Amino acid sequence: MSQIEFKDVRKVYSNGHVGLDRINLNIEKGDFAVIVGLSGSGKSTLLRSINRLHDITEGEILIDGKSMTKASGNQLLEMRRNIGMIFQNFNLVKRSSVMRNVLSGRVGYHPTWKMVLGLFPKEDKIKALEALDRVNILDKYKSRSDELSGGQQQRISIARALCQEPAIILADEPVASLDPLTTKQVMDDLKRINQELGITIIINLHFVDLAREYGTRIIGLRDGQLVFDGPVERATDEAFNEIYGRSIQDEEKLGVN
């Protein structure tokens, strides 16, 4: 049984635009899967359908054999708790401390009133500190989030996802706003988390060379259709040309080794 299964998934927006067109796809536990494609190809729609930030129109998505599509109430909350999310714009509470932002990864485990009052148990605080240590910013735990650099803020969001103790982490263009050196540091963090903790990483990336360097598997979308799915070794220039419908351009290469 695959960890994530897309079964004939279709997403049609209210304006009639087809975001996903009959996607059939299996993602295995421990994959570092990179989704690539031009802007508007369906990358974010595919990623965000996994935890139902976007609901699909037809088909079904299964997580560990359970239907995410049909889940509701407590079952949906429990399934989402197992899926961490990292955003391009970090999605932090800027005026809150680093520690408080990371602890927000624990909200799915406790009653809302306790979280509003900041009543996190000692065990959660230990998990938060361990998550910060794993991404090398433990020394910033008392700082306000808006005092930190973009790269540090993205590391906070990774630590927040880790604090959930997820089996899957979704990352939607997490390095799009970062400089090349910081990009590599963040990608190294994600790769290490994948390898050391066995957490499945599914990530949207714009840069071809990053996809090849860090991914174990490449998933290519064009106009909402799955046009490539295979190990990174098969992701040749010709394969990317097929995914993009044109040659790779210089701005699609980060150029950092």
Curated annotation (Swiss-Prot):
EC number: 7.3.2.2
Name recorded for this polypeptide: Phosphonates import ATP-binding protein PhnC
Domain ABC transporter: 4-248
Stored PROSITE patterns: ABC_TRANSPORTER_1, ABC_TRANSPORTER_2, PHNC
Cell location: Cell membrane
Membrane-protein topology: Peripheral membrane protein
Enzyme class: translocase
Any one Gene Ontology molecular-function term assigned to this protein's record: ATP hydrolysis activity
GO terms for cellular component: plasma membrane
Highest rank taxon of the organism: Bacteria
NCBIfam families membership: ABC_phnC
Residues given in the record as ATP binding sites: G37, L38, S39, G40, S41, G42, K43, S44
Similarity field: Belongs to the ABC transporter superfamily. Phosphonates importer (TC 3.A.1.9.1) family.
Keywords: ATP-binding, Cell membrane, Membrane, Nucleotide-binding, Phosphonate transport, Translocase, Transport
UniProt keyword annotation of Cell membrane present: yes
InterPro entries cross-referenced by the UniProt entry: AAA+_ATPase, ABC_transporter-like_ATP-bd, ABC_transporter-like_CS, ABC_transpr_PhnC, MetN_ABC_transporter-like, P-loop_NTPase
